[in-house]
UniProtKB/Swiss-Prot annotation:
Its main location: secreted. InterPro entries: Conotoxin_a-typ. One of its GO terms (cellular component) is extracellular region. GO terms for molecular function: acetylcholine receptor inhibitor activity; toxin activity. Alpha-conotoxins bind to the nicotinic acetylcholine receptors (nAChR) and inhibit them. This toxin selectively inhibits alpha-3-beta-2/CHRNA3-CHRNB2 (IC(50)=3.51 uM) and alpha-6/alpha-3-beta-2-beta-3 (CHRNA6/CHRNA3-CHRNB2-CHRNB3) (IC(50)=0.94 uM) nAChRs. This is Alpha-conotoxin CIC.
Length: 21
């Protein structure tokens, strides 16, 4: 999903959702 892709580009979101990346 594009939302997960955007989260993958955000370091803060990546930390909170490391399982998505």
């Amino acid at each position: 999903a594009s939302g997960a892709d955007t989260c993958c580009s955000n370091p803060a979101c990546q930390v909170q959702h490391s399982d998505l990346c």
